[in-house]
């Protein structure tokens, strides 16, 4: 499972975690400039570690397995390694991992059969509100269930090579298909639950990977998921990736944001 490559030490505040392999949008393309204004780049000690989604001026949604002891984020970026006048840098004042996510699983070197990675969500409260512009815009939470067969767009920055840590400078996009959860349940030893989504291409070659964790999955124009975990190597035929099913968490997200405004 690829997110464990990135976070066995880093996830709980360690500082010596090795960089991940196989960590990229697979089979994707350069996103059209400023086409994903809700896309967030999450950093730890100046290193890009995860993606995220801007929900409003004060809050970013990402994956719970991206948990570290301090964060900073960039909003409105297209190029990971270049300065962009329109991009905005923010520190994070506090993080709120979903209380139902089992953090202890991140310390394991292998995934035990039946492991449950449900609730892989975390909210980040920005230390200063984002300025809403043409290139920095929030995206709304879903109001209806996603439908299998929908065309989905995932995005993120990550390695463009399979065996060494060479990140893409350009934000990458990839079109994948939302599949019935049974397609994932058949090929994963871990639990596949109703708070997860299964998406990819059964023929392989198009996928998200560890560097994309926490980034958006937009199906038929609606934010429906965030990247959670998937096969290693990424894009493996017959093995779609797993995303968090956001409509199952609307209440928790809204309540957490309201109580910690």
From Swiss-Prot:
Disulfide bonds join 31-173, 50-66, 152-219, 184-198, 209-234. Keywords: Disulfide bond, Glycoprotein, Hydrolase, Protease, Serine protease, Signal, Zymogen. Glycans are attached at residue 102. It is an enzyme of class 3 (hydrolase). Its EC number is 3.4.21.35. GO terms for biological process: brain renin-angiotensin system; zymogen activation. It comes from the Eukaryota. It catalyses: Preferential cleavage of Arg-|-Xaa bonds in small molecule substrates. Highly selective action to release kallidin (lysyl-bradykinin) from kininogen involves hydrolysis of Met-|-Xaa or Leu-|-Xaa. This is Kallikrein 1-related peptidase b26.
């Amino acid at each position: 499972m690829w997110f464990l490559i990135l976070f066995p030490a880093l996830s709980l505040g360690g500082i010596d975690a090795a960089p991940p392999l196989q960590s990229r949008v697979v089979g994707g393309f350069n996103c059209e400039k400023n086409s994903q204004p809700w896309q967030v780049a999450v950093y730890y000690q100046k290193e890009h570690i995860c993606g995220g989604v801007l929900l409003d001026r004060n809050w970013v949604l990402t994956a719970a397995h991206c948990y570290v002891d301090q964060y900073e984020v960039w909003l409105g970026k297209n190029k990971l390694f270049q300065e962009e006048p329109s991009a905005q840098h923010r520190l994070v004042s506090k993080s709120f991992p979903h209380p139902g996510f089992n953090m202890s699983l991140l310390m394991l070197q292998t995934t035990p059969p039946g492991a449950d990675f449900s609730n892989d969500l975390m909210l980040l409260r920005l230390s200063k509100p984002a300025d809403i512009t043409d290139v920095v815009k929030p995206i709304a939470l879903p109001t209806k269930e996603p439908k299998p067969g929908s065309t989905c767009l995932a995005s993120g920055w990550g390695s463009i090579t399979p065996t060494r840590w060479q990140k893409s400078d350009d934000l990458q996009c990839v079109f994948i298909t939302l599949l019935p959860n049974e397609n994932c349940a058949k090929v994963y030893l871990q639990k596949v639950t109703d708070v997860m989504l299964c998406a990819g291409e059964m023929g392989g070659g198009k996928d998200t990977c560890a560097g994309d964790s926490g980034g958006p999955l937009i199906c038929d124009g609606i934010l429906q998921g965030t990247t959670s975990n998937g096969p290693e190597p990424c894009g493996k035929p017959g093995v779609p990736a797993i995303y968090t099913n956001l409509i199952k968490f609307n209440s928790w997200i809204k309540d957490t944001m309201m109580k910690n405004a």
